[in-house]
């Protein structure tokens, strides 16, 4: 055999064994991260911060973790700034980009002064409890801020329990994968010492129109003073983002195993403490949160001084 023929055979051998793996790696996995509410829709209101700010901060941190550690994943955000986006457009963004996964990030609330706390992850379905229905009603009420919402959502009334009957008859072919991701998310939250309130189902419009595995995450209760304080700090937001990233890694590895792909996900995330570039969305958001904390601190100090003088 000539030297030239020998090299040719070796080349074919290498292509036969390694090209399939390379081709599998070339398939980009797309995840859409949806920061709930925004712009004229503040979401749930806390004492010192609105839901929309927490959602955006955690969404950007989660996206950055994936971008820094998962080379075969494309991250798309429904919003990276404080702006209002219609619920159906959030789903459309995922569908247009042929996303493999949709994660909508929210913050829960009940009546002020409540001690209810903990994380929940929802998949699409009929709410089996009054509590789940109330959460869905709260999140779906964002459509009331949209133009022509009655036409856009075919007469759906977010405040009417009758409107939610349609979800009982909806069959979602991605339900199994959605529940799998939701379960991993709740496990990760439990591992970082958050109260695990479980995987639940409810009729969320933003999940109804997506054509891929989808979940809606409630990070905690902004109506609970301790949880609000945790969620408004950079350290708390980092922990929540890292828990979501950990769950994403496990889901993605299972996905790659089923598809026969080579996973490009790194399990241990790079620290999310880096300083964002000046003028970036994350930098502007950090400055707003710092200003709010300083204002609150000054207000508390003034109040204490007044009380001391009055004694």
Residue ranges and their predicted role:
Residues 9-18:
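Bacterial N-terminal signal peptides
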Residues 43, 162-265:
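Active-site-adjacent mobile loop/cap segments within catalytic or ligand-binding domains
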Residues 24-156, 171-175, 179-183, 238, ...:
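Catalytic-core regions of hydrolytic enzymes
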Residues 162, 289-294:
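Polar/charged, compositionally biased leader and regulatory segments
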Residues 152-161, 216:
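Flexible hinge/switch segments at interdomain interfaces of large molecular machines
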Residues 1-9:
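Bacterial N-terminal signal peptides that target proteins for export
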């Amino acid at each position: 055999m000539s030297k030239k023929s020998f090299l040719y055979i070796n080349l074919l051998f290498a292509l036969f064994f390694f090209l399939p793996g390379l081709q599998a790696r070339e398939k980009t996995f797309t995840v859409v991260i949806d920061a709930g509410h925004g712009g004229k829709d503040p979401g749930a209101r806390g004492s010192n911060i609105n839901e929309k700010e927490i959602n955006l901060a955690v969404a950007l941190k989660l996206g950055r973790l994936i971008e820094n550690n998962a080379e075969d994943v494309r991250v798309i955000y429904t919003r990276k700034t404080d702006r209002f986006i219609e619920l159906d457009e959030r789903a459309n963004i995922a569908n247009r980009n042929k996303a493999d996964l949709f994660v909508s990030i929210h913050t829960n609330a009940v009546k002020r002064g409540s001690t209810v706390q903990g994380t929940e992850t929802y998949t699409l379905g009929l709410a089996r409890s009054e509590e789940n229905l109330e959460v869905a009603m709260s999140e779906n009420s964002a459509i009331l801020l949209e133009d022509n919402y009655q036409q856009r959502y075919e007469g759906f009334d977010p405040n009417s329990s009758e409107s939610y009957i349609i979800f009982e008859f909806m069959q979602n072919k991605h339900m199994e994968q959605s529940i799998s991701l939701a379960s991993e998310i709740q496990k990760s939250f439990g591992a970082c010492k958050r109260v695990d309130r479980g995987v639940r189902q409810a009729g969320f419009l933003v999940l109804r129109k997506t054509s891929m595995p989808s979940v809606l995450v409630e990070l905690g209760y902004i109506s609970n003073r301790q949880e609000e304080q945790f969620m408004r700090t950079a350290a708390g937001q980092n922990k929540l983002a890292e828990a979501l990233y950990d769950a994403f890694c496990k889901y993605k590895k299972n996905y790659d195993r089923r598809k026969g792909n080579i996973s490009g996900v790194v399990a241990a995330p790079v620290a999310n403490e880096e300083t964002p570039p000046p003028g970036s969305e994350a930098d502007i958001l950090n400055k707003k949160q710092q200003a709010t904390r300083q204002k609150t601190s000054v207000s508390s100090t003034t109040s204490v001084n007044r009380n001391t003088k009055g004694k």
